[in-house]
Amino acid sequence: MRRIIAMGLLLSTLGVGLPMVYRTIHRRFFGVRAGVVLEDQRMEYYYEDEVRVIVEQMARHRTRPPVNASLEKTTGEIIPHKNGLYFDVDAIVHSVVTAPSKSLIRLEGIEVVPLFRTEHLAELTDLLGDFSTPLLGSPGRVENIRLSLAAINNTIVLPGEVFSFNEIVGERTIERGYRNAPIILGEAVVPGVGGGICQSSTTLYNAVREAELQIVERRIHSVAPSYIKHGLDATVAWPYTDFKFMNDSDTPVIVKGEIQGWRVRVWILGKKGGEFE
């Protein structure tokens, strides 16, 4: 205390204004203690609100969200989950402002485990729904179906998540490989880019029905398609007509789809009878 007062008097005699002297003394009384270091950042004499700004910036650069396990779209190879890292800013700020002099404080993160982990994928082996339709039409139509099935293949839908066909498949354009093929427009059949992918959405719809998952959005064609009974179809058109379903089960499901011989097949894998072990 005497040293601080003496320092204040010395600064005054050197012509330093009283407001600056007061601020200097106030920081030494109420700021972080001398010699306190957070990682490699000197923190001495900072006020708590200043410490918080520094800690938040450090935490922001080091924080990483957890990443669920997933599947490689083409091969189905497992992509392992990644743990995240979270920082309790309030706790770190408290550690800094209450630290004794000459303390070295480490920015300790808290590991965050994702909800859906690598080991869970091994349990999603039950066949919940399986449906196929006959493959018909021109090479362009077949290619459009192949591309759309490749887009939805190996998609994991978490509990409570909504699967959107349009969102997963994306816009059907020439640049993305889609070709001109017949599409149903009103009461007419006309050429259009991406013609045929409604067979993919229809086959998916029926697999979802068999899996007893909740249908969120579906429309049927105005003209019955040749590959399925009218009323069991699900038309899609970018971006306004979509097919959506929700995974209202307790565990994730995997959507799989591919052309097998002269059949378009979509099947749903999951876990029957409850939560993960």
Question: Where on the chain are the PLM-derived regions?
Answer:
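Surface-exposed, secretory/extracytoplasmic low-complexity segments enriched in Ser/Thr/Asn/Gly/Pro
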Residues: 1-277
